[in-house]
Amino acid sequence: MTATIDNTQSQATTGGVGRVARVIGPVVDVEFAADELPEIYNALTVDVDFATASEQVEGETKRTLTLEVAQHIGDNMVRAISLQPTDGLVRGALVRDTGAPISVPVGDVTKGHVFNVLGQTLDVPRIEVTERWPIHRPAPAFDQLEAKTEMLETGIKVIDLLTPYVRGGKIGLFGGAGVGKTVLIQEMIHRVAKNFGGVSVFAGVGERTREGNDLFLEMTESGVINDTVLVFGQMDEPPGCRLRVGLAALTMAEYFRDVKRQDVLLFIDNIFRFVQAGSEVSTLLGRMPSAVGYQPTLADEMGALQERITSTRGHSITSVQAIYVPADDITDPAPHTTFTHLDATTVLSRPISEKGIYPAVDPLDSTSRILDPQFIGEEHFRVANQVKQILQRYKDLQDIIAILGIDELSEEDKVIVGRARRIERFLSQNMFVAEAFTGQPGSFVPLDETIDAFRRLCEGELDHLPEQAFFMCGGLDDVQAKAKRLAERS
């Protein structure tokens, strides 16, 4: 039988009925009969009269709030966190226990649509739903996991060469404010989702509504939206919503992996906002804060999300996660806790972005589990190491150059500095999603071409070309054409 879902949470009530005892912001205490206490994580619903709420909808007299049980606090009371604004909620209001956790629609019907944390559609009034899954689910068992390791080619030189991504792995994009995390994650959607052949799921966790709107319109124009599911819990949402929206998106992705037997790309922007929401909820529940004011359950909450993002027999979820680094401090507990779960970490650097080099990836701080000859081959590994050695030597010489000047270096070091500066510039690349702003077309550089170009750079074959020729270019053909134009101008 097909159920129709519009913008209301499923109302199948199998639990008890209680009454609101206290409301403090998004925290709601509810009293139930002793034999009807709901379980932890159960969804509760309560109707709010629009006459007492600031939010009015034409033609409707009530709206339904969804709460999630977080604690049993004694005296037949439970403490719940609201996933929507609680304005208009009053003491004594009837609260119904749904008897189950929050659930979201799954399946092909979700493709091409935008949802909130409750699985309500935001782009259309209603969709026909045949199946819903709860957002709280166990991670796959050990014997279900897939051990195969395969590289995911992106066509972005700095990533493919120095921090190669794993198909079915977890990828982290670390960076402070304004260094290009969201642009890079949108570029990954553009490059990988178009050629991927599977399904893409995007979770907007606590980020700007404008960015979500731009992403939806861009995907619609490019045609990618038909194989994409978007789930949003933005900056203006209560912390309970922002804490659960990642799980809602992941649940939809798991259905495609486990039931439809498809490979899935999961994009999460931003994991830090997930942690931040957990910290807010923890404080609201009165828990003792841990390091730097974060919740004591930080590692547990992160593990519950990350361990579900994995490959099972023959099919995978590949996740790309943007991680905001507060005050550019990579040792902050939020990014630090995320590190342990990732297969590849791409660190975006402010000093590099200040030079105008984009993507502003720090080639020395970024790492990958598969940067190993066993997975990527001897030639790729050797060239990547050569590039890193030259860049590290250039970094070591920075203080000497700043104090004495480049003329005081030995001839050998001068050659290394020249190559390092060319490498730095050649690691820049025009992005497809930035074409409208830069006026320059994006470029896709095959891995073999990237390896060959950097091998020639490291061995000195390109020392005769000017540094400017390497800036924001694709392959070597672009560099040589640009060098020719520069020579003609001079």
Swiss-Prot record:
Molecular function via GO: ATP binding; ATP hydrolysis activity; proton-transporting ATP synthase activity, rotational mechanism
Keywords: ATP synthesis, ATP-binding, Cell membrane, CF(1), Hydrogen ion transport, Ion transport, Membrane, Nucleotide-binding, Translocase, Transport
Membrane topology according to the record: Peripheral membrane protein
Matching SUPFAM superfamilies: C-terminal domain of alpha and beta subunits of F1 ATP synthase, N-terminal domain of alpha and beta subunits of F1 ATP synthase, P-loop containing nucleoside triphosphate hydrolases
Top-level taxon of the source organism: Bacteria
Subcellular location(s) of the protein: Cell membrane
Uppermost EC category: translocase
Residues the record lists as binding ATP: 175-182
GO CC annotation: plasma membrane; proton-transporting ATP synthase complex
Membrane-spanning ranges: none
Catalytic activity from the UniProt record: ATP + H2O + 4 H(+)(in) = ADP + phosphate + 5 H(+)(out)
Keyword Nucleotide-binding applies: yes
EC nos: 7.1.2.2
Alphabetized InterPro entries for the sequence: AAA+_ATPase (IPR003593), ATP-synt_VA_C (IPR055190), ATP_synth_F1_bsu (IPR005722), ATPase_a/bsu_AS (IPR020003), ATPase_alpha/beta_chains (IPR050053), ATPase_F1/V1/A1_a/bsu_N (IPR004100), ATPase_F1/V1/A1_a/bsu_N_sf (IPR036121), ATPase_F1/V1/A1_a/bsu_nucl-bd (IPR000194)
Oligomeric and partner information: F-type ATPases have 2 components, CF(1) - the catalytic core - and CF(0) - the membrane proton channel. CF(1) has five subunits: alpha(3), beta(3), gamma(1), delta(1), epsilon(1). CF(0) has three main subunits: a(1), b(2) and c(9-12). The alpha and beta chains form an alternating ring which encloses part of the gamma chain. CF(1) is attached to CF(0) by a central stalk formed by the gamma and epsilon chains, while a peripheral stalk is formed by the delta and b chains.
Protein role: Produces ATP from ADP in the presence of a proton gradient across the membrane. The catalytic sites are hosted primarily by the beta subunits.
Similarity section: Belongs to the ATPase alpha/beta chains family.
Name assigned to this protein: ATP synthase subunit beta
